């Protein structure tokens, strides 16, 4: 019993030490930033219901060893699924700071010096029954973009221009006559990363909130009734600059079953990822659906539900390039 109690005490002590170490490291990095207020804005294309952009307005106040993140003035709660719960808003800020200061260990102590002012009455503090299915994959990345753009000028060697900032969610469902069964295909897509002070942005990188991308097209074609016409880089999509943004992804697939439905939850279809330090914005996300003899572009550009497809129709997606730097 004494041994077990002693081990528990040591674990508690070690956990406290790890948290304290991470907290102190984050504080030391924050001191690289001069005291002051740093502002930015980032935009969601629309909420998928009302075709108007949503603004994320951010003011970061640096005072000594702390940063305060204030999203007051951001757009009001929306009707569509692009609201963010508070937990996602907080974690998106923490994620962005982890990208900026990757040396700091990941534990709760690292976030103690990061104070997020609760964004009451905005779409970044959603409450039931507001729909929130787009917050984790899409809104989170735009929050991170706002943090990057606010701090890039004061931390030019640590912060990049904005990355593609979308998970490229594409769902296709229907009935596969070859297997005599229903199917649902889900594809996540990469995009270009922002350029930085040292080099061009990464081409077709994973989304900034995860490490998932689509399986090889050969596997997708084996499992689902689709044929990829091409799967390549979105040539020239990176924003121009001293260090250009990385290229996004360009893919086109054909429907091989009799009927299917396509849905998209993406972003950056209206505004490209922001450039930094004078660099230009990256190219926007583009979705085109070829239905028989007509080309359909979603009303909300990057968001649409249950587009009806028949055999021979095609889906063509170009994901955003990263912003240019300098």
Report residues per predicted region:
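Flexible, glycine/threonine-enriched loop-and-boundary segments that flank and lead into catalytic domains
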Residues: 36-59, 233-236, 296-300
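Amphipathic alpha-helical
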Residues: 13-37
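Single conserved hydrophobic/aromatic residue that forms the stacking wall/gate
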Residues: 1-12
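Short beta-strand elements
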Residues: 54-73, 174-176, 181-190
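Helix-loop-helix junctions within predominantly alpha-helical proteins
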Residues: 27, 84-88, 92, 99-292, ...
């Amino acid at each position: 019993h004494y041994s077990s109690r002693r081990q528990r005490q040591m674990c508690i002590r070690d956990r406290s030490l790890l948290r304290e170490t991470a907290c102190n490291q984050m504080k030391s990095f924050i001191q690289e930033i001069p005291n002051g207020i740093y502002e930015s804005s980032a935009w969601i294309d629309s909420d998928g219901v009302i075709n108007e952009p949503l603004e994320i307005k951010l003011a970061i106040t640096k005072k000594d060893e702390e940063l305060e993140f204030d999203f007051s003035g951001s757009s009001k709660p929306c009707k569509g699924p692009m609201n963010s719960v508070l937990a996602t808003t907080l974690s998106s800020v923490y994620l962005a700071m982890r990208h900026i200061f990757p040396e700091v260990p990941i534990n709760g102590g690292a976030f103690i010096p990061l104070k997020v002012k609760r964004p009451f009455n905005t779409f970044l503090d959603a409450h039931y029954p507001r729909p929130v299915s787009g917050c984790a994959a899409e809104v989170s990345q735009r929050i991170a973009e706002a943090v990057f753009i606010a701090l890039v000028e004061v931390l030019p060697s640590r912060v990049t221009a904005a990355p593609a900032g979308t998970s490229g969610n594409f769902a296709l469902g229907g009935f596969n006559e070859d297997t005599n069964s229903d199917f649902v295909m889900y594809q996540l897509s990469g995009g270009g990363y922002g350029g930085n002070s040292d080099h061009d942005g990464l081409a077709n990188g994973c989304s900034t909130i995860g490490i998932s991308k689509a399986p090889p097209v050969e596997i997708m074609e084996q499992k689902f009734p689709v044929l990829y016409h091409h799967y390549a880089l979105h040539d020239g999509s990176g924003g121009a600059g001293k260090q250009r943004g990385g290229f996004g992804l360009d893919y086109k697939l054909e429907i091989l079953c009799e009927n299917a439905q396509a849905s998209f939850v993406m972003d950056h279809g209206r505004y490209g990822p922001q450039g930094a330090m004078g660099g230009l914005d990256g190219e926007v996300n583009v979705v085109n659906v070829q239905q028989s003899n007509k080309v359909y572009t979603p009303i909300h550009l990057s968001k649409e539900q249950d587009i009806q497809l028949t055999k021979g129709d095609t889906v063509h997606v170009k994901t955003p390039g990263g912003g240019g730097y300098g």
